[in-house]
């Protein structure tokens, strides 16, 4: 049974936590004692219905404010597949949490309040979904009950969002629209009795039917070395293994490999996983690889196939960045750049453009990027990094920028 990773997104109070609670409730994924606790908590708030958002708004601050701050991971399953949902914050102050929560998902559920329509934070979340290359985006027009389930309202919002989607850089991604009511369970797991005019799938049907190809297994092979194993025991006196997680592609015993950045070459002798010898391993597998010759390999080196084009050694390059700090990004600033497990200093050479997420237009010649703004930059690193263009190999094309004094993550970037 496969696992589908999903992330919710949307502005504050668009109903993300309620939607997830509804999915859990209607798929019988909530225990009896939790339902009883939910009933008690809902009555305490003076409600005559189950406040399903309380299932995921776990932090005390979230319950008091009625918003999601941290990224909560929720698990449920159907007879078809298992699901992991990242309930990400909608408030603009917590956009960084949304970027983190959506970084490795296959489906993004972007909620829109039917009363509000398109707002800036919705446009920002669409831009982030496009930037992260999330394969499927479902735009859920929620709270249809508050607009009397009017088809005209849904179509009006859909039209404005369709225009925005057309202007956004979605490449090979599927974008669809659903009218729903999380509060009353309309079009979540069963057809909406109050919206007979909508003939499409329910949300759960969309999720169940979604199929995706694991593209990373077919990308260029990359194996970042996380740890060098040298037991130095009687039984394993000469053993030298390289442990890590294959980030993309496939490696087989007998493959000729090249080490980056040194350029040394060798051949794979064995691949082991949990002390079991394998003939091959693919993206996502955590393994230990041994080579036929003793060469100098350290933590942070990357193994690639000698027959493939090696990841370029980048020192001066361009990137798209989402800025996550209150202190603006300006040319000349220096940060720590972390790519995989490697960290080096990086200096911002230039901000080439800033994206207007609503108009989907770029402004050139800007001198800063402020909190939650998206733009393109040029930067120079102290040491080269073995990185691919993000669009071709997402697992090896992303990085973060870190403030070297506060150690806070201030930006997330994508190599272009």
Model regions: which residues?
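Conserved catalytic-core segments of large NTP-driven translation/proteostasis enzymes
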Residues: 155, 163-299, 304-327
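Conserved nucleotide-binding/hydrolysis micro-motifs of P-loop NTPases
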Residues: 14, 25-26, 91-92, 115-119, ...
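P-loop NTPase switch module centered on the Walker A-proximal segment
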Residues: 1-93, 105
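Conserved Switch II/interswitch segment of TRAFAC-class P-loop GTPases
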Residues: 81-83, 88-94, 102-126, 130-155
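Residue-level signature of catalytic and energy-coupling elements of molecular machines
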Residues: 13, 19, 38, 66, ...
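C-terminal effector modules of nucleic-acid-centric enzymes and ribosome-associated factors
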Residues: 5-9, 146-149, 153, 163-166, ...
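Helix-rich terminal scaffold detector
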Residues: 2-29, 41-44, 111-112, 138, ...
